[in-house]
Amino acid sequence: MSGDTCVQTWPCSYYLELEKRWVPGRLSLTSLSLKFMTDKTRETLVSFPLSSIIEIKKEASHFIFSSITILERDHSKHWFSSLQPSRNAVFSVIEHFWRELLLSESGAAAEAASSSMTKGKELTCLMACTQKRLEDTARVLHHQGEQLDGISRGLDKMESDLDVADRLLTELESPSWWPFSSKLWKTPSETKPKWDASMADSKAFGKEGIVIQVPAVISQRTESHVKPGRLTVLVSGLEIYNSDSLLMHRFEREDVDDIKVHTPYEISICQRFIGKPDISYRLISAKMPEVIPILEVQFSKKIELLEVAMMLGSTRTSSLAEKGYSVWHAASGLMDQATHCEPSSGSQEGRPLQLQTSEPVISEEDTQELGQILRKLKGLALDTETELERQDEALDGITEAVDRATLTIDKHNRRMKKLT
């Protein structure tokens, strides 16, 4: 499960209060917990959920240098020192996941209530996640369609300009005594402002369309220098901001050379250059599993899943598929029971005992909510299919227009060479 996926592991030392000594080992962080394992015996000395933490601090004293302290609800205090690559880097990552867990809906309250979640609620949550994923994909397709429309308008204007060039070349090729040379061409002045305005509107609306924003821990050159910030995924590219909402760097969509997915929570973005250093950022975020599917749609040819990420992704996908199938199977059976099984007067004596021992049926409220989500999914799927078909037709038209423009430009070049 994603909650058991290791986000980061750091070499460090843990202070044993009873024995008054430091123990070397490794501190491991998952999206839901933190644990320390010794180097010699591989024994787990401490392990606790992030939801039990009430305070994370950077402390130091005359005998404990450059440490991170973690205080739990039961007032247990843990000291970690000799942190690599640096104390600030480890502190920033742990604090980020701790804050995101407290702020998220699936934090401590949702975790406590998950044990009593009914099959109907599980199915509703699964369908809601599917709906959100489809909405994100539809939003990307919508902005992509607007960009294709802008390209089509640009090609139309190019054809209009080539027609003007054709008439101008015809005038230059005609004899000086030809009386109709000045009437061969006119510039459609009313077309250009109209196109420029529509293109500007389309560019302002589609190019800067925000798909998703997530908080992240950002490092650029070395892992020891990290800072909190934000990753913004746009239709036109990616933007990285610091904690003061100041833009650190903007990657245009065509400037991104590769995106590597190291874990479900960590990616690196690189823009390569010849003759000067590459621009590369490494980002860790608790919300990264929501971003990666969108990046796979936008940068399908540039994104690379590394071996660990592929293994974890396939495991998570298979487990989710199995869980989804089991929930669907159970829920469909329960919905059939709730819909088709009407209690008869002769069987009411044994019915209460059967209901007490069986799984709880889907409530009427869950059934109505599922129906609404399914109707929205159907509408989104149909709209997405229509948009894809429209974009296929637009791409065919763009291809034909580019071919025509290429032939026309070649013909004009030959005519201009004859004139010179």
UniProtKB/Swiss-Prot annotation:
Biased composition (Polar residues): 342-357
InterPro entries from the UniProt entry: PH-like_dom_sf, T_SNARE_dom
Location of this chain's protein in the cell: Endomembrane system; Cytoplasm, Perinuclear region
GO CC annotations, alphabetized: endomembrane system; perinuclear region of cytoplasm; plasma membrane; presynapse; SNARE complex
GO molecular function: SNAP receptor activity; syntaxin binding
Superkingdom of origin organism: Eukaryota
Residues annotated as domain t-SNARE coiled-coil homology: 110-172, 357-419
Region (Disordered): 338-357
Biological process according to GO: exocytosis; synaptic vesicle fusion to presynaptic active zone membrane; synaptic vesicle priming
Keywords: Coiled coil, Cytoplasm, Membrane, Repeat
PROSITE patterns named in the record: T_SNARE
Subunit structure comment from the entry: Forms a complex containing SNAP47, VAMP2 and STX1A. Associates with the BLOC-1 complex. Interacts with BLOC1S6.
Family statement drawn from the similarity comment of this UniProt entry: Belongs to the SVAP1 family.
Function: May play a role in intracellular membrane fusion.
Protein name as catalogued: Synaptosomal-associated protein 47
Species of provenance: Bos taurus
